[in-house]
Amino acid sequence: MYLRRAVSKTLALPLRAPPNPAPLGKDASLRRMSSNRFPGSSGSNMIYYLVVGVTVSAGGYYAYKTVTSDQAKHTEHKTNLKEKTKAEIHPFQGEKENVAETEKASSEAPEELIVEAEVVDAEESPSATVVVIKEASACPGHVEAAPETTAVSAETGPEVTDAAARETTEVNPETTPEVTNAALDEAVTIDNDKDTTKNETSDEYAELEEENSPAESESSAGDDLQEEASVGSEAASAQG
């Protein structure tokens, strides 16, 4: 309010001046030309200076604040862009690390499975051999029932085992002894199965022959005795 009154007074002073000013002296023009003061009293001039100074300072302060705020916004925008780029780059690096870890785990898993499978096979092979031995010991009666079939199977057995051993050695020359023993056990089981089947068939044929002709049974018994004698002589010669 004080500034408003001062401004109104300074603007109203020229209007209130008389239309016909008082006559001046001869040197009045020189005084006016030499003086640098604004028209009006000294108090009104001071108020004018204050108003102008305040307006200029306010304008300068406003300009300074706008410039500094623009700079601050610009710097914040730059920092936000940098943070966004970093946030976009770091997830890709994390994904690459996760992919590398999964690949390592997948490469290690098959090796562990292979080692476990080998251990399981090595543990199961002794039990399989024990079962085969029990089956072979459980059927001695069938072997005694038909000497002809046993002789044939005895002749063919070593050949089959030798062939199986050769095949295993040719296919896998660098395999472990456990694998070769497993192959030999399988060959022995095959031979035993063949022996049992042949023994059963020979028993059936013998029953049929006995029912049909007793004479043929006697001749076959003689032939069996001759074959047993020949087998015994061969065994004695081999031992000698």
UniProtKB/Swiss-Prot annotation:
Residues 1-40 are cytoplasmic. Residues 170-181, 228-240 have a biased composition (Low complexity). Its main location: mitochondrion. One of its GO terms (cellular component) is mitochondrion. Residues 191-201 have a biased composition (Basic and acidic residues). The keyword Signal does not apply. InterPro entries: MGARP, MGARP_N. Residues 64-240 are mitochondrial intermembrane. Expressed in the brain, adrenal gland and corneal endothelium (CE). Expressed in steroid-producing cells of the ovary and testis (at protein level). Expressed in steroid-producing cells of the ovary and testis. Weakly expressed in placenta. Expressed in corneal endothelial cells. The chain crosses the membrane at residues 41-63. It is found in: Mitochondrion; Mitochondrion outer membrane; Mitochondrion inner membrane. Residues 202-213 have a biased composition (Acidic residues). It holds the Pfam family AIF-MLS. It comes from the Eukaryota. It is a single-pass type IV membrane protein. Interacts with RHOT1/Miro-1, TRAK1/OIP106 and TRAK2/GRIF1. Interacts with RHOT2/Miro-2. Plays a role in the trafficking of mitochondria along microtubules. Regulates the kinesin-mediated axonal transport of mitochondria to nerve terminals along microtubules during hypoxia. Participates in the translocation of TRAK2/GRIF1 from the cytoplasm to the mitochondrion. Also plays a role in steroidogenesis through maintenance of mitochondrial abundance and morphology. Plays an inhibitory role during neocortex development by regulating mitochondrial morphology, distribution and motility in neocortical neurons. This is Protein MGARP. It comes from Homo sapiens. The lineage of its organism: Eukaryota, Metazoa, Chordata, Craniata, Vertebrata. The gene is MGARP.
